[in-house]
Swiss-Prot record:
It comes from the Eukaryota. The lineage of its organism: Eukaryota, Amoebozoa, Evosea, Eumycetozoa, Dictyostelia. It is an enzyme of class 2 (transferase). It comes from Dictyostelium discoideum. GO terms for cellular component: Atg1/ULK1 kinase complex; autophagosome; cytoplasm; cytosol; phagophore assembly site; phagophore assembly site membrane. It catalyses: L-seryl-[protein] + ATP = O-phospho-L-seryl-[protein] + ADP + H(+); L-threonyl-[protein] + ATP = O-phospho-L-threonyl-[protein] + ADP + H(+). This is Serine/threonine-protein kinase atg1. The active site is at D135 (proton acceptor). Its EC number is 2.7.11.1. Residues 281-389, 402-447 are annotated as: Disordered. Belongs to the protein kinase superfamily. Ser/Thr protein kinase family. APG1/unc-51/ULK1 subfamily.
Length: 668
């Protein structure tokens, strides 16, 4: 166990590429905490945007003290090794809300109302602070304990930010299945985007699955355009009215925050109480009006990990919404903050258990990342006196109203400016060489021909740039998908034929495991999902080979599923089997077999093993998110490619040798 200040780090309960979360406890009080350990140097080196998100998370959590919001109690760092910071956070033993929904399948309307009231009260507090969350989903809602009536708490503020209620943002963030349509379409959006996410969460509580479910952004956009959601008839009319009001694609028609808080079904304004985790009752109105001077004082000690002005660190003195119950609900949560920013991927980067000689409050860490941006606070762009002026990276991320020229328009988000369309003419970039005047005068006719050729070339370049822009946008959308979804788009899967080959390679692994239905079925499903992702709305336009293979493996899947015993229908009986791990292990095994065949000069067989292994690794490369995992798979792919090229070359040489030998023999 490792000691950090007055806290002991015990069991690791979550990890990611840049941070880990430990179960910990206070040496003085023995209270449990979740301690998030962040490698800020590695984080900044990898992506400056992630550094900003960490700053926002700490800045926002510092401002918040509420029953229905996960608390940040302290931020520490080691004096001798400032590489890491330690975020001392509230520990929630009940896990995340998605696990609760999966366990209970569909919630009763009464239980859904119980949780929705708590979510609404937490969001009402955020609205009072002018904070938009931007990544609301069940995985980011935590439960205080495993009791019948746990307290729901909003967590993971990595994407959250302070925002003017009427300002627009064009930052693309959040989880697509819970993301508002205006964000998916990369349009400017307001605080109403969170209301869509609330509607999807409420729908999932009552129905057991998200209103729109897809493995790719294009398909999700298609569903939003064509699919109409239907609610079970047993849901009350008031509840149905709220869901339909929240899930309005047109932002103007979507319910407002004020109307949401005052909605008849939620009934937040009455004095009805609902039970808490201890079996007691607490009033809805008390949630937002409890004061606790001790917790408020704790917040004043919390500072930012990365080069932040500390002039306004006492902004919390204006916070009159603190809660008395926070310290009474700190329990060990093996899932707490597991979905926090940068904590979604498996990474064994941290293994150092040495105790530091000294730990102190991180009032001014020795980092100077993006220092120029921190000076923007001197500008008087913000007309809203309620928004803190000390927010880090204030204007380079469009936090609130600033001069129009400082806000990048969404239409030029990924657009190259080397050629810009200005009406009927094409204006060259001012730094282009073609802007220079020529000293030799050409004949008029020759000049006209030359100008026409240049215009044609410029138009072609412009079309290519527009196509590249669309491809980049599509790729960016897909990479933001949740890790448990298969990421399939035109950038990653180069062609229908390549998808077909990858799917068949996975399906053939299933063929080898037909005697183990619990392993065969997941592999078939994976292969069918892969093929289906490339079948257009009109299947008749697909190659016969593609459709026939899809149909054949679907038939095999149904046959195995229907003829096997009931255990195959309950994956919990064989939960240790991981299709992706099985694919990874077999890819490496194919590499070994290919190498053996290559040693014996069996080049055709060796090439087949290398090809199958490459296809499996390409599939894994298309779904993996963790940077370390990506690097490992990339190295294997490069090694397979090298051996494949050598095998092909040796195979051609061996064939030529045989031909030459036969030719000599014939001549003699």
């Amino acid at each position: 166990m490792k000691r950090v200040g007055d806290y002991i780090l015990d069991k690791r309960i979550g990890w990611g590429a840049f941070a880990q979360v430990y179960k910990g406890f206070s040496i003085k009080t023995n209270e449990p905490f979740a301690i998030k350990v962040v490698d800020v140097c590695r984080l900044a080196d990898k992506n400056s945007k992630l550094t900003e998100n960490l700053n926002y998370e700490i800045r926002i959590l510092k401002e918040l003290s509420h029953t229905n919001i996960v608390r940040l109690y302290d931020v520490l760092n080691e004096e001798t090794d400032p590489t890491f910071i330690y975020m001392i956070m509230e520990c929630c033993e009940g896990g995340d809300f998605s696990k609760y929904i999966r366990t209970h399948k569909k919630l009763t309307e009464e239980k859904a109302l119980y949780f929705m009231k708590q979510l609404a009260n937490g969001l009402k507090f955020l609205r009072q602070k002018q904070i938009v969350h931007r990544d609301l989903k069940p995985q980011n809602l935590l439960l205080s304990d495993d009791s019948e009536h746990p307290i729901l708490k909003i967590g993971d503020f990595g994407f959250a930010k302070f925002i003017d209620p009427f300002s627009l943002s064009d930052t693309f963030c959040g989880s697509p299945l819970y993301m508002a349509p205006e964000i998916l379409h990369r349009k400017n959006y307001t605080v109403k985007a969170d209301l869509w996410s609330v509607g999807i969460i409420l729908y999932e509580m009552l129905v057991g699955e998200p209103a729109y479910n897809s493995g790719s952004v294009p398909d999700l956009l298609n569903q939003l355009q064509n699919k109409k959601i239907k609610l079970p008839s047993h849901i009350s009319s008031d509840c149905q009215n709220l869901i339909y009001s929240l899930l309005q694609i047109d932002v103007e028609k979507r319910i407002s925050w004020e109307d949401f808080f005052n909605h008849k079904w939620l009934n937040l304004n009455n004095n009805d109480s609902y039970k808490n985790n201890s079996g007691n009752y607490f009033n809805n109105n008390n949630i937002n009006n409890n004061n606790n001077n001790n917790t408020n004082n704790n917040n004043n000690n919390i500072s930012y990990p990365i080069s932040i002005n500390s002039n306004n660190t006492n902004n919390n003195n204006n916070n009159n919404n603190n809660n008395n119950n926070n310290n009474n609900n700190n329990n060990n949560n093996n899932n707490n903050n597991n979905n926090n920013n940068n904590n979604n991927n498996n990474n064994n980067y941290y293994n150092n258990n040495n105790s530091p000689p000294n730990v102190y409050h991180a009032s001014s860490l020795p980092y100077d990342f993006n220092n120029n941006n921190n000076n923007n606070n001197s500008n008087n762009y913000n007309n809203n006196t309620n928004v803190p002026n000390s927010l880090p990276f204030a204007y380079n991320n469009n936090i609130y109203s600033s001069p129009t020229e400082a806000i990048p328009q969404p239409t030029t988000l990924n657009k190259s400016k080397s050629l810009e369309n200005t009406g009927n003419t094409i204006r060259a970039h001012p730094f282009k060489d073609d802007k220079k005047s020529t000293t030799i005068q050409q004949p008029q006719q020759q000049q006209q021909q030359q100008q026409q050729q240049q215009q044609q070339q410029q138009q072609q370049q412009q079309q290519q740039q527009q196509q590249q822009q669309q491809n980049r946008q599509l790729s960016n959308l897909s990479t933001d998908f949740e890790r448990d979804l298969v990421i399939l788009d035109g950038e990653e899967l180069e062609s229908m034929e390549r998808v077909f080959n990858r799917a068949v390679a996975i399906a053939e692994l299933g063929d080898l495991r037909q005697n183990e239905p619990l392993e065969c079925v997941p592999l078939y499903i994976l292969a069918l999902k892969l093929m289906k992702s490339k079948i257009p709305n009109d299947p008749s336009s697909s190659p016969d080979k593609f459709i026939n293979t899809f149909t054949e493996y679907k038939r095999k899947l149904v046959h195995i599923f229907s003829t096997s015993n009931t255990s195959v229908k309950n994956q919990d009986h064989h939960s240790s089997f991981s299709p992706n791990r099985f694919i990874y292990e077999n890819a490496l095994e194919f590499g070994k077999k290919g190498a053996v065949e290559e040693l014996y000069n069996n080049y055709p067989t060796s090439l087949q093993f290398y090809t199958d292994g490459t296809l499996l690794l390409e599939y894994l490369s298309s779904i993996v998110i963790d940077s370390d995992d990506q690097e490992i798979i990339k190295k294997y792919l490069n090694a397979f490619e090298v051996r494949t090229q050598i095998c092909k070359k040796n195979y051609e040489n061996s064939k030529n040798t045989v031909l030459n030998t036969n030719s000599i023999q014939n001549n003699t």
